[in-house]
Regions:
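Stable alpha-helical elements in mature extracytoplasmic
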Residues: 51, 55, 79-83, 134-137
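N-terminal export signals
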Residues: 3-4, 10-31
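Contiguous mixed-secondary-structure segments that line small-molecule binding/active-site clefts
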Residues: 2-3, 88, 98-169
Length: 169
């Protein structure tokens, strides 16, 4: 009978040590992938849509696949000019487009456009946005139009020409 008691004690001791060891080690859980659906305001073959895809690839690679961004071309879910509302309402998780597309909601959003050459060039606009109060103003404007979004500038849009005319103006 002594040997049975000894076996039971050894079993209980081993079990207690194994239990303590199990509790002592952190549980390693594989993180689940978070998937986000973005849409751009550009057709699939447009260079700016490619920029959006490049951004998504960088994020996907940096997170080791834990965050996966899918970028859809314009019109896949909503028309290009409906992108801000779709993101704001949660229909899409994010978007890639031009701020000036929302000019109809507040004319001050035209400041982020690529207007004629007598305005700020792309680098000046980026500098003003980051260091001159532009970001704070954009946040206020989006709040004023009821947009529930967080925005950041991904890159500059080159200045577009004023126009093409048959006769000098």
């Amino acid at each position: 009978m002594t040997s049975n008691a000894s076996v039971r004690r050894k079993f209980m001791t081993t079990g207690a040590v194994a239990g303590a060891a199990t509790l002592g080690f952190p549980a390693i859980v594989k993180a689940q992938t978070t998937s986000l659906r973005f849409q751009s305001t550009w057709p699939a073959k447009d260079i700016f849509h490619e920029y959006a895809n490049d951004f998504a690839k960088k994020v996907n690679d940096m997170t080791g696949g834990e965050l996966k961004i899918e970028v859809l071309p314009a019109g896949s879910v909503v028309p290009a000019f409906g992108l801000l509302d779709a993101v704001s309402k949660g229909t899409l998780d994010g978007g890639h487009g031009v701020v000036v597309y929302h000019y109809g909601k507040n004319s001050a959003l035209a400041l982020w456009g690529s207007g004629p050459a007598f305005g700020m060039d792309a680098n000046m606009l980026l500098s003003w946005h980051k260091y001159g109060g532009g970001k704070a103003l954009l946040d206020k404007l989006y709040t004023a139009v009821g947009a529930n979004v967080y925005s950041y500038v991904y890159g500059p849009m080159p200045t577009q020409p004023l126009g093409w005319f048959k006769k000098p103006i």
